[in-house]
């Protein structure tokens, strides 16, 4: 069964454990600059919001890549960059409407979240549960039904 990263910004404290875990998992070093997940800080409101590749169905990055270096991993559901095939042209970074593919200066290639092969380090490291790895079929409709069941039948406001 496919799983996805679910991010609940209301639970994020901005501790950056997700960024540290990601960089260590992928590069063996604790460096937020090398993380494939980022925590955006909305200074005006004090809100912290983790964001990374959503592994979207449209996969604009994959379709834009002129050398087909991005492939869909059928096991994890992730769009994965083949670093051997990638030529570093950055077309995928332009195609991604979410800005979650990054060019890595040291390698001359791009990087993006690959769900750590099915066991995302960011979700495991998150101390507040702001990042979880959940069943992909648990959709918004399922959440609404769950809330409705919790609330029971309420009288209408007629």
Range-by-range predicted roles:
Residues 2, 31-67, 83-158:
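Flanking helices and flexible, charged tails adjoining ferredoxin-like Fe-S electron-transfer domains
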Residues 10-30, 35-42:
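A positional/architectural concept
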